[in-house]
Amino acid sequence: PQKHTVFRVKCPKHIPEMPLTGDLTTGVYWRPEGKEYLAGSPKSVFDADDLEPAWEDFEELVWPALAQRIPAMEELKLTGGWAGYYDCNRLDNNAVVGKHPKFENVYLATGFTGRGLMQAPGIGRALTELITTGSYQSIDISNMAVERVLGKKARPEPYVL
């Protein structure tokens, strides 16, 4: 599993209609959560033994990026944070979906790093087609196959929010 830290911050000037936003130059992301904001960065570590938030990332990465993009965030206050695990593979941070090449009747849909809920309808449909017809019919997701991981053919996902 990959450990990610999420920070909760309060800003004097609340902007309630701001959508989930990501700064692709730094990887820092943020979104409103009630009267506060949640923010984080793509910096992560593969450490299954430590769930303590990476507080230093707030000062070094998150706050500077927020203040640069949204000047009002210069005055924000850190109100909390937590760390949790993302399900992913070490090769490229992308999901693994499809029939297992070595085991009959085993199908995989794993490693979505928090994107599973958004991708579930399409993945469900694709797997249903694969199981019932032997191939993908409406959307070809063969590039997510387990052979990609076994053959170490990475399709890197640089921004895991």
Q: Where are the language model's segments positioned?
A:
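Active-site lid/adjacent beta-loop-alpha segment flanking the redox-cofactor pocket in flavoenzymes
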Residues: 10-108
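Predominantly flavin-linked oxidoreductase catalytic cores and closely associated redox partners
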Residues: 1-5
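C-terminal catalytic lobe of FAD-dependent flavoproteins
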Residues: 67-161
